[in-house]
């Protein structure tokens, strides 16, 4: 498994599962979104995101903006990006 060129990211928001999979060397990072966070019980997006970042400070974490218009998405993305050195911001694309 060490010669796999694909990086495996877990697409989850449950803190218990993030803690579990963060210990797995095969998992290279995490990605989540506002919908998954809400289902996991998040009430405050920033506070919940910071909990995720505290669990896995050394792996990439992709967080998604939840605004609907360009200016708000850009503003949110810039703010979210300051939450940690390992943060990657996702911008949803729709037709």
Give the residues covered by each predicted segment.
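Active-site beta->alpha loop and helix N-cap motifs at the rims of alpha/beta catalytic domains
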Residues: 3-19, 23-27, 31-95
């Amino acid at each position: 498994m060490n010669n796999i060129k694909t990086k495996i990211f877990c697409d989850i928001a449950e803190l218990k599962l993030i803690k579990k999979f963060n210990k797995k060397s095969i998992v290279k990072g995490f990605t989540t979104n506002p919908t998954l966070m809400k289902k996991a019980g998040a009430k405050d997006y920033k506070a919940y995101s910071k909990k995720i970042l505290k669990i896995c400070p050394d792996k990439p974490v992709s967080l998604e903006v939840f605004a609907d218009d360009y200016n708000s998405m850009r503003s949110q993305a810039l703010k979210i990006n300051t939450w940690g050195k390992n943060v990657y911001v996702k911008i949803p694309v729709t037709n």
